[in-house]
Curated annotation (Swiss-Prot):
EC number: 6.5.1.8
Active site per database record: 400 (gmp-histidine intermediate)
Protein name per its UniProtKB record: tRNA-splicing ligase RtcB
Subunit structure, interactors included: Monomer.
Presence of keyword Ion transport: no
Taxonomic lineage of the native organism: Archaea, Nanobdellota, Candidatus Nanoarchaeia, Nanoarchaeales, Nanoarchaeaceae
């Protein structure tokens, strides 16, 4: 299908509004990244979304955009609240897949002799892989509380510190969640998966600070020096979130016969009971994901204490920030000079509110919302902060990762498992995985250049680079 694409600035591209499109499509990318997007259906999928009713301003594709289910991954779309479409495919199957960054008071020299032991201990405590269950087996009644209260349930039950909830987007809890909107099938899948990583591109990394770009902001977030040890957790709502998406997609597919450019964009009208139930179930799955990352944090803290034989106060392991990158949120944005309440979908995109935004607090309000962009296995990750330009360009959103460029099938054919492990060892990275496939599918070559994605994000003024981290150990499914 022919896409009319015009370049309107160094890193800004547009598919002009025409035909059935209700708004133009804006793509933020370098020449190199836009060429990658042309290789799959990213641009076609973004144009399809622009044809949906009630969409405002423009459909956005972030620099890490690539083909997904329905809308592209790296897609951001905002809709007026005048009975807009509620689109499960625009949140995706891994509801509140997100990342959490922890900082320590340690340098790599203090732990390098025990790094292998530490990785093994975390691997024991935090299961990874498809369908893997965790240490916690919840009754359905208890699981309902997790779904309704998110991170609050975890902290109230001793799995965290009081200050943890103040270092999480939305305080780790969406108040419109309702466990009754989540099917029993989804609950059965999720009841023993709290505190687990899962498979695919999910991981837990022990990292070190590689470079600090803004010392004042880094210090405010607890990042003080090069070679300081950090931990990055990347996971979501596991089988429960996947089932929520499947349940509602199936229901909407059967019940609503709207003329959509792609059946994967099936939706229910916001004012319908079905749409409201999906939003309640999505919020419940998001709460589950925040509780999941909280339980993993708890076990990481316990593992560090045991292996290093130090108390947690001297180790640190405070949360720098935790954010969602697959979610729908109700937010206020300025459209044509007027403030409007909108529903904003971010699918493979990170909220990036600027300094002073009313939804931020403490040091985040002063410096901007932290944006954590993980790289692929073996490559750097970045900490940035949201900037004012994000509100104008991308509904307060930023990139979320490197963005896949090779399918899992193709990635597996490039190297043998032993070759990948050897290459990573040569880079000084320990890898512990449940399966060989999990490593082969996630080789660095399967992803776009993280440095390029971050550079474009920074130069556009969407987010500002604060620090870069490099992995020393990776745990995968």
């Amino acid at each position: 299908m022919d896409i009319k694409l015009r370049k309107i600035d160094k890193y800004i591209w547009e598919i002009p509004k025409e035909g059935k499109m209700n708004v133009p499509v804006r793509i933020y990318a370098s020449d190199k990244l836009i060429e990658k997007m042309k290789e799959d259906r990213t641009l076609i999928q973004a144009r399809n979304v622009s044809m949906l009713p009630k969409i405002v301003k423009h459909m956005v594709v972030m620099p890490d955009g690539h083909e997904g289910y329905g809308p592209p991954i790296g897609g951001v779309g905002a809709f007026s609240l005048d009975n807009p479409p509620v689109i499960p495919g625009f949140v995706g199957f891994d509801i509140n897949c997100g990342v959490r960054l922890l900082r320590t008071n340690l340098t790599i020299d203090e732990i390098k002799d025990r790094l292998n032991l530490l990785v093994n201990e975390i691997f024991r405590n935090v299961p990874a892989g498809v369908g893997e269950g965790g240490k916690l087996k919840l009754s359905i009644d208890e699981l309902n509380k997790v779904l309704d209260y998110g991170v609050n349930w975890a902290i109230d039950n001793g799995f965290g510190w009081e200050e943890d909830r103040n270092r999480i987007e939305s305080h780790g809890y969406l108040d419109f969640a309702d466990s009754d909107a989540v099917s029993n099938t989804a609950k059965q899948r999720g009841k023993d998966q709290l505190g687990t990583i899962g498979s695919g591109n999910h991981f837990l990394e022990i990292q070190v600070v590689d470079q600090i770009y803004d010392e004042e902001i880094a210090k405010a977030f607890g990042i003080y020096e090069k070679n300081q040890v950090t931990v990055l957790i990347h996971t979501g709502s596991r089988g429960l979130g996947h089932q929520v998406a499947s349940d509602y997609l199936r229901l909407f597919e059967k019940k609503y016969k709207y003329d959509v450019p792609d059946r994967e964009l099936i939706y229910a009208p916001y004012d319908s009971k079905d749409a409201q139930n999906y939003l309640k179930a999505m919020a419940a799955a998001a709460n589950f994901a925040w509780a999941n990352r909280q339980l993993i944090t708890y076990w990481v803290r316990k593992s560090f204490e045991k292996v290093l034989r130090k108390n947690i106060e001297s180790i640190g392991l405070e949360i720098v920030y935790d954010l969602a990158h697959n979610i729908a949120k109700f937010e206020e944005h300025t459209i044509d000079g007027k403030k409007q309440k909108l529903i904003v979908y971010r699918k493979g995109a990170t909220r990036a509110f600027p300094p002073g935004h009313k939804e931020l607090w403490g040091e985040y309000k002063k410096y901007g919302q932290p944006v954590i962009i993980p790289g692929s296995m073996g490559t750097a990750s970045y900490l940035l902060v949201g900037q004012p330009k994000a509100m104008e360009l991308s509904f307060g959103s930023s990139a979320h990762g490197a963005g896949r460029q090779l399918s899992r099938v193709k990635a597996k054919k490039l190297y043998s498992y032993s070759e990948v492990i050897r290459k990573l060892r040569e880079m000084g990275i320990i890898v512990k995985s449940t399966t060989k496939t999990g490593v082969l599918e996630e080789i660095p070559e399967a992803y776009k250049d993280i440095d390029e994605v971050v550079r474009v994000t920074h130069e556009l003024g969407i987010s500002k680079i604060v620090a870069r981290f490099r992995p020393v150990a990776v745990i995968k499914g």
